[in-house]
Amino acid sequence: MKPLAPFALIFGIFPLAALSQECAPGWMRIEGERAAAVAPGALIADMARRDVVLLGEHHDEADHHRWQLHTLAALHAQRSRMVIGFEAFPRRVQPVLDKWVAGSLTSAQFLAEVEWDEVWNLPAELYLPLFEFARLHRIPMVALNVERSLTETIAAKGWDAVPPAAREGISRP
């Protein structure tokens, strides 16, 4: 029997919850440009069969992060082999995420080592339940972002001004 491939949950890229300032009263499935109401159980079951699920939010909305945590828990109950990607972290902090999931850091150490206040600058309390869930269940966390200096250089000077070695593995947009 072929083992299930782990699937990834990527937070903060696609704004499903961010369609409004408040969480939607019902669950919505968005495919392409179409959105349709769907029963939560059916949507979770469908998401659990996918290789990648994108859960977005307004970064400063606590309700959106609670929704992410509840969705994550429901998905984990159906498919425990998963990976969670976070746009909050630049790739260079991946070793810190690995130490966190392994249980080698306190919350304070983790936030200091990922330079939370400098890099993300949002209340950590909004995100810590997600990080703690990953740690509790030993779900790998993946740093998805690039350094702010790279995005600033691209915005100011254009893609071609960035030497290939400084592109952090990113291809032409």
What are these regions (language model features)?
Residues 61-66, 81-83, 91-101:
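Membrane-embedded segments
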Residues 19-50:
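N- or domain-start disorder-to-order transition segments that initiate the globular core
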Residues 6-17:
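Bacterial N-terminal signal peptides
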Residues 53-56:
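Short hydrophobic beta-strand that contains or immediately precedes a catalytic carboxylate
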Residues 1-5:
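Positively charged n-region of N-terminal signal peptides that target proteins for export
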Residues 58-61, 89-93, 147-151:
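Solvent-exposed loop/turn segments at secondary-structure junctions
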Residues 66-77:
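Histidine-anchored nucleotide/phosphate-binding helix
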Residues 95-173:
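A substrate-binding/cap region within the structured catalytic cores of diverse enzymes
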